[in-house]
Amino acid sequence: MSQSSVSAIRWANNQLILLDQRKLPLQEAYVNCVTHVEVADAIRQMVVRGAPAIGIAAAYGVALAAAEFGSDRDRLHRALETLADSRPTAVNLFWALRRMRGLIDGASVADLFPLLVEEATRIHEEDLQANLTMGELGADLIAESGRGALLTHCNTGSLATGGYGTALGVIRSAYRRDLVTEVFADETRPWLQGARLTAWELCQDDIPVKLIADSAAAHVMKTCAVKWVIVGADRITAHGDVANKIGTYGLAVLARHHGVKFMVAAPSSTIDFELFSGADIPIEERTSDELKFVQGTPLAPEKADAFNPVFDVTPAELIDAIVTERGVVLRPNAEKMLKLQ
């Protein structure tokens, strides 16, 4: 099974090459990173986004730091801190940096660069394989409900991961098994990841997609025979609470009201077993300009303030299934989540 026709992260000629997701779908442009600071800036400015992709990019950023600083552990540790500060919510970032730090602290060789490139590449490849596994496990759940429409939020495909996708990987696998009549993609304000990225990915793979306004989700669930809402995750607690793109919580509430199943697909690296309550997940807030402007064009009065949290937390009791490469947890709770540790 191929990963998809989309690739957002490449390592070539000792550079990290990122598809600039801010410019999609109108332009396919790339950003070449040759320093760890450039990688951190790319993460912060959302050139690359999606929890797994952020972790992968950060791992390559550590390798670039070794190209800059050699075996100077102090400077490498500061580079790790710079990368860790780029986005606060996605736990995959910190998971990947812990792996890279363990290699830095444990290696005895003078030249760390090839070792760190190898580890970053391994993280990248492991994510792709995890996504392929999740795709099949999630499609098995969809098969139990029968063929029908799916609804997804934000972007969880190859653009957000090492390839194939988490929630979008499930959708890809289900479509290949003729389980999907159509996909409804929320536009996902304010960055419009659904409109710009998910719709673009699905069109690239010739999967039928209908873009909807975020506010149309309830009507679509009520009238369009949606079988599953399928989303990704930026952090999952030990009890099964899920932090994901703002609007996910509302979709879970709507799905429960309309009798629609709600699935979260994410690699096990997204689970933070040291965090027990979703209330303790740090929620990133971004500038009000992201709400008040689109590509430099004002949408709101200049004097109007804006509140722009970019994640919310869906409690475990609203989730029907969490799908990881290690297995599936139905109706998650603390005891069931332990099987994924």
UniProtKB/Swiss-Prot annotation:
Substrate binds at residues 49-51, 87, 193, 244-245. InterPro entries: IF-2B-related, IF-M1Pi, IF_2B-like_C, Initiation_fac_2B_a/b/d, M1Pi_N, NagB/RpiA_transferase-like. Its EC number is 5.3.1.23. The keyword DNA damage does not apply. GO terms for biological process: L-methionine salvage from methylthioadenosine. The keyword Amino-acid biosynthesis applies. Pathway: Amino-acid biosynthesis; L-methionine biosynthesis via salvage pathway; L-methionine from S-methyl-5-thio-alpha-D-ribose 1-phosphate: step 1/6. The record marks 154 as: Transition state stabilizer. It holds the Pfam family IF-2B. It is an enzyme of class 5 (isomerase). The active site is at 234 (proton donor). Catalyzes the interconversion of methylthioribose-1-phosphate (MTR-1-P) into methylthioribulose-1-phosphate (MTRu-1-P). Belongs to the eIF-2B alpha/beta/delta subunits family. MtnA subfamily. HAMAP family: Salvage_MtnA. This is Methylthioribose-1-phosphate isomerase. The lineage of its organism: Bacteria, Pseudomonadati, Pseudomonadota, Gammaproteobacteria, Oceanospirillales. The gene is mtnA.
